[in-house]
Amino acid sequence: MLLTLVLLPLVGIALVSTTHWNNPIVVNKDGSIVSTNVDPDAKAKYIALLISIITFVFSLSLLVLFDPSTPEYQFTYAFGNKEALNTVFTSDFQLGVDGVSLYFVVLTTFLFPISFLASWKMKSAESDQYNVKFYLCTLFVLETLLILVFIVTDILLFYIFFESVLIPLFLIVGIWGGSPNRVRAAFLLFLFTLMGSLFMLLSILALYYNVGSTDFNMIHQYAIDTNVQKLLWVGIFISMATKFPLWPLYSWLYRAHAEAPVAGSILLAGIVLKMATYGSLRLLLQFLPDASYYFSPLVQTLGVMSVIYASLVTLRQTDFKVLVAYSSVGHMGIVVLGLFSNSIQGVEGSIILSIAHGLVSPALFMLVGSVLYDRFHTRTIRYYRGLVNYMPLFSVFFFLFTIANAGVPITGNWIGEVLCMMGAYQMNPIAATLTASGIVLSAAYSIWLFNRITFGTYSNYLNYTTDMNRREFNVILPLFVLTLLVGLAPNLIIDNIDISVSSLLY
């Protein structure tokens, strides 16, 4: 099943790359040239959307067939003969999912149909007929790599796919970004995260030297000396702290978000940052538990500083996308606080908050980076006022996702934040209390933002416009429904991850 899940996006690449480009320029019999409104890339877009939906539906079968009563890897698949592979690679190309990785796989496959719909207005110029097809294929490559990050059961392969994700991200930001600064933002994204991951590579090589294997199960069963754990932990944590990102390693994130196309922002906030959550769970908490406990006060301090600093900086932002990007830094700080609380509630809360953030943040990027920007072509907050008069449906959804981002009850963010705070309070009451103040600040900037752009007289800087169309509504509605579902029925997630989390910690 997992092999099929990996191959489906590759099938999408093959189909999209072979579609015919429909020239929107028509030459009449009299020699006159007429430009039509036909989208020349419509066929490729429909194929990409269909394949991504099939991939998502197929991933749901994993959710239905998953057995939550065991912490073992399920739906496992091994490539070829193990002994033959070991003579060349010293690692096993095996696939499998457990409760920790299951929902990250489903979240990945869910966000790609959303991303394809969000990119629907992109068109190829006549001088570059392959631009959109290349873009769609790049998204499929990114989906394949992200799925592999969450399902490989070998630490060396995990590192390879973890870093390979940077290549399509670099292309998405650098080629299809929104301004001339996109190339600089793409290089900053690539180099910043790559430099952090070099330390993880050194730790993985040292881990192989000590254990003699890169297989997850073998590493988990091996008793590593505590002092060695600490050295390995530092190298891996630097990479994860850059990817979350934590203060002070966040500067690449808001620049990448500001320049990325809306689909790039959706995927970057929705699932790419969650690789750090999964990597911390798997590599730090599971393989290096003694070192994780030893360094937890330091990590929780960084988490608290990230929450408070990001919330304060967000209050001063004038750019929509940068504001939402900084709010992501704050939420991931709470995730870190729960991860290193050494409690089941905290770790489960961090997973739920990661999933909820992977729904709310993409919705906000869609609303401000696509719905508003496509109409008014500016992300400057001070230009907006009185949108409720002409865009009531947008205003309703923007209000709902703004308060969800602030962590109000019956939303997934609230459940995740409460569990993270409960777990953190047991270990570090001061850190939990300070983080609560950061959550109050997040409510402050959320309410200010909604009030600023929605109410009052309509801004003189803006042209009169229409409300959300059907495509935009179809993108936002599933995100809203799932956000409520996670908030109202968190047991749907907790029941499937409880045994795996308990086994991971104890």
Protein language model regions, located:
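Predominantly late transmembrane helices and immediately cytosolic-facing juxtamembrane segments
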Residues: 361-365, 430-464
